[in-house]
Curated annotation (Swiss-Prot):
Cofactor(s) the record lists: Mg(2+); Mn(2+)
EC number: 3.1.3.16
Keywords carried by this UniProt record: Hydrolase, Magnesium, Manganese, Metal-binding, Protein phosphatase, Signal
Gene Ontology process terms (BP): regulation of intracellular signal transduction
Domain PPM-type phosphatase: 92-457
PROSITE patterns with a match to the protein in the record: PPM_2
Family from the record: Belongs to the PP2C family.
Protein name: Putative protein phosphatase 2C 76
Signal peptide feature range: 1-34
Catalytic activity: O-phospho-L-seryl-[protein] + H2O = L-seryl-[protein] + phosphate; O-phospho-L-threonyl-[protein] + H2O = L-threonyl-[protein] + phosphate
Amino acid sequence: MRLGCSGRRRRLLRAALLRLVVLVLVAPPRRCAGESATCLAVYREGGAPAVFQSAHCPRWTLLAPSAGSGGEGDGDRRSSSSSPPPPPHPRGCHVAVDRGRRRSQEDRAVCALGIRIPFIGIYHKIKEVDVGVVAVFDGHNGAEASEMASKLLLEYFLLHVYFLLDGIYSIMFRKSTGKLTYKEVTILNNVINLYKEDQSSHSKGSCWALPAILDRSFHMEVLKESLLRAVHDVDLTFSKEALRNNFESGSTAAVILIVDGQIIAANVGDSKAFLCSESHDSSIDKKTSVVSGKRRRKRNSNNRDDFALANYDGPFYNVKELTKDHHPDREDERSRVEAAGGYVLEWAGVHRVNGELALSRAIGDVPYKRYGVIPTPELTEWQSLSANDTFLIASSDGVFEKMTMQDVCDLMLRVKLGVNQELGSFAVTQRNLADYVVDLALEKGTTDNVAAVIVPLGSHYSSKVTLEDWYMLEENSKTSISPLQTIPYQQKSGRFNVQ
């Protein structure tokens, strides 16, 4: 299985995973694994970075550029006449990234929807799970960390899904390799406990019926663990690169998985992820907030529009926050920093680690790791999307320099209602929603880079794409992963924007 970027590409990783689960279901007990024993050992020892670099895993090749190879660090993402045009962005993703008043662009964004991942379900049936990945990376002290994170996150995530399933299926079907050695017991305690209980009652080396763990919760835990490992490995890869090249940059990471109507958020730093959810709160305060927001956006507001909003009896949007900022003035974050020998000092009105770094968790920032700055994400639990959840939004902190999350949700309502004269008629499928957020942040005077990803939710807005849009299987049937085009763009005054 070779993942490449040639024109003859067809359903790559999905085909690889399908082959794996079919092999597990039909192969003899000692031949259940899809990878060689040596490659599995490489994975267990060093994770995704080791697999992509090892000669023992020739089927896996990462073609993404290193952090020091250039890219969008200058803030103007220009297309080259010698390079093929970027692939179309998945429908349903609204992405905008703007340099703002900064000299360089250090923000990055990723949005991939409709990734179909096959799992073995109960009764030996193959179940394809629809997965979406939304992420924002806010770089600082350079774009190297955010650039590498945006290039590697999805590749690492999907590789971990593949290898975790390979290892788990091998154990469940009593493959001769015995037990997992790469922290597999951390996937889920109740899953592993079921393994131990069932292993004690079955003869060694025999395949046995799939246990009850292969219900809808099994794949959710595999995906969650894959996300955690992907973020860990992105930091590991970048930190090694930073030491080699004397990079001092770091990055936030706000990542959301969307899986079969449920979401989970992993956060490192102070980028934000949240939902705008419909509420039939018709209070005067809510109406005043929306109307005044409109007036702030355009001083010469149309009185008719104000009247329409003031008399609007439909649902408003409330914020459902999915992430918490990692600043060193947070009590638990400060305690960790101080326990590691660092200190927190307020400078220019901002609490900073050792008086310098304004974050207590980050990808990269290698000089501060010894002082308690960690890349470990703070993770929510899986939560079901309700019928009222209308927009999923991830943004860098540049958006919130002059705005609040509620301001963003109020803006989405005004856009949806189409009452702003300058917005014209509104159609989700024809206009980039993220542009509205970025434009308003800049209009309000933010000086930072700005990035926003918006995914409209609900059946009215849903538009699925298949894994074929991202991964294709080449004819030579070997495996390598090519970099995904994370922000297909049209240049617009230093901005990347796409719908």
